[in-house]
Amino acid sequence: MQKQGAGLDLIAVSHDYGRRRAVDSVSFQVAPGEILGLLGPSGCGKSTTLRLAAGLEDLQSGEVKIGGDVVAGGRVNIPTERRHVGMVFQDHALFPHISVAQNIAFGLGGVSAAEREARIGLWAGRLGLTRLLPAYPHQLSGGEQQRVALARAMAPEPRVMLLDEPFSSLDSRLRDQIRDETVDVLKLAGTATLLVTHDPEEAMRMSDRIAIMQAGRIEQIDTPAQVYAAPATPFVARFLSETNELPVKVAGGAVDTPFGRLPAPARMPDGSAALLMFRPEALQERAAGQGATAFTVERAMALGAYRRLEVSAAGQRFAARLPAGPLPPSGAVLHFGLNPDFCFVFPAA
């Protein structure tokens, strides 16, 4: 029986490929019913971390627990098929020579025929696949194939679900729909889920918490709102969205900027070099004379629900993100203030 409160637990997990450290002392927990997004660029170690959790790579250092039980670490190495994990990958990996129903039933060899049929019907119904049960994978759309892969992974009632870039092959509108359906299914089942992705929007849309990974290490783990509003490092700030950056100096517990003074973190001594980073939405249009700075519009783009402007002042160029509206012409002068809620000051590298 699964221990109460236990889902997936990685403790000081490390892994080397030859002389290259791919995963470096990674630790995190995923509770039942929680979706943890493991977010980072290609080659950062996130897929290796998932494979270590699944048992697809032999653990070299650390410990992996599933449902409160050690499945890897020390002398323990439980094979993948006995770890009670479901997995969905980018290519779906459906069996082309058998039907949708048979694909969903693939992992149900240990249950009775009646239970097998019940689970096929349950997951086909939840994912809108009932009418497609007799069909074969080549007869399905990309979204339908993704739903079959998810149904097959969920039918054995896994303790942990592992998703490795599962939506990247879908077009954008369908991708959003399948993401939302997947979250609904995982929450309904109460399954601890690790989602590996390089897409910040996907991680923020689907995850309860996000672990941001770089060069084999976790840089920050927190809620989507918190990692966006209070990034722990410049890498986290840059990876989540576009940033504007200015070199500044700390003086009197603050930094001077073209927009006025902003508070510096208490740990940064006076005279130290610092980096000011702020998101495009930190630039907020104001009337002249209200503590605002004049900027010249270099370029303006309509991007649906918002406008992206490139503006300049004192030889420096910045990106601004404003609500949808008329586009100002190049050369127009606009006045902006800076919202400190979207500003971050870090020690200079």
Model regions: which residues?
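ABC ATPase nucleotide-binding domain
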Residues: 9, 29, 65, 335-337
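Conserved A-loop
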Residues: 15, 27-30
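ABC ATPase nucleotide-binding domains
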Residues: 35, 84-86, 90, 94-235
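The feature captures the beta-strand-to-loop junction immediately N-terminal to the Walker
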Residues: 39-41
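Helix-to-loop junction immediately C-terminal to a conserved catalytic motif
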Residues: 54
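ABC ATPase NBD Q-loop/coupling interface
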Residues: 63-83, 112
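Non-catalytic connector elements of ABC transporters
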Residues: 243, 253-349
